[in-house]
Amino acid sequence: MRITVLGKSPSWQDADGACSGYLVEERETCVLLDCGNGVFSKLRCFRDYAAVDAVVISHMHADHFLDLVPFAYALTYAPRQQPATGSHAPARPALHAPRGARDLFRRVVGAWGSEDLIEKAFDLHEYGAGDELAIGSLKLRFSRVPHFVPTHAVEFSSALNGAARFTFGADSGPSDDLVRFADGADLLMLEATLPTPESDGERGHLTPAEAGEHATRARARRLVLTHISDELDELWAKAEAEKFFRGPVTVAREGAVYEVPVQASRLPA
């Protein structure tokens, strides 16, 4: 399994950066995980957008889904998608988003008179906590995490043997449920948005130190910090996580590729 970082910024983009977006690939299967501001342009630097099998959205905040709009326009109007000038079988990727997404998409794009743009361009399916699905050679599971709108951590594993596991924590405050869901992950990607915890009200984000603590409790093999601004010192963030997690820690960078190897101990006998 291979994960490519297309965008790792929080709600405001880094200079020349993009918000949340990751390619998850195994064998011939290609899934785009989140599609925030700037991600569609970054996707085109790495892959043919028409070759994406499915898009998975962790939650309905703009920095995680807004570039579905240019993606949908490309799928609808690009010359290659027209029978007269392009393919006779235009691409229509699956789109998996949380329950209620269809209505929200319609309200967002309906503001300029194209309320069904996204559901026509994509094969839209809504999911909830505890759901499982298969996309090509990948198997996905979803678990609710604490954030300001319904948000789900996503686990990717091989549908063939389940041996390689990548867990994406999405946007989340501190969560015992997230720790349990990520137990034993080969690669755990957690947000590290804030230098210090929110002081008032509901928690919806982690600090680098909290990400490290969660990774240790989840017995993860490797930790990648993401959803982190270029205004936050990378070496400091890494050191904060390393205070609590003894495994390898990396701060996500656009263009970085992470391989998730099959662990022999997890292969079926």
Which residue ranges define each predicted feature?
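Active-site neighborhood of divalent metal-dependent phosphoester bond hydrolases
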Residues: 81-82, 88-93, 98-124
